[in-house]
Amino acid sequence: DRPEDPVPLYVAASGESAARLAGRVADGLICTSGKGAALYTETLLPAFEGGATKAERDSSGLERMIEVKVSFDRDRQRALEDTRHWAALALPAEDKMGVEDPREMERRAAALPLEKAASRWLISDDPDEHVEQIAEYVRYGFTHLIFHAPGPDQLRFLEQFGSLVLPRLRARFA
């Protein structure tokens, strides 16, 4: 059975071609944060718009979704340490190519200095600072934010982020 409303389909993109395809055929674009402003403002979002234009689609109704990597904790050191659980994200592509054994990937990630492991994350212990960090993605043009927290205690994150950061985000952007 088909649902009454069509299920929205998004295309994930990390480069220009996939972003253009998303603009041509999908209900939205999805990508991940932490890769530098130029990727979003000069490549992905313009290609997405260009794809929609080429397909004669009105892009104003299309979603621009981003998974924002956030590590928020009232204890800043804990927020920093939590990024260690996803340290592999900070490995350069050439260090991940051809690695088939997850234990080898874990070994490579564990060898990274903490500052490097944390480099793809927005890290803060201050709710207002965190809102400012996240606001960059709204300014780039993203319309749908998904938050990804790295630490093992997801309930702790949800309670703190949900009570301290989300109300400020909603007040500012809702």
Task: Go through each PLM region and give its residues.
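Active-site-adjacent structural elements that line small-molecule/cofactor binding pockets in enzymes
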Residues: 1-174
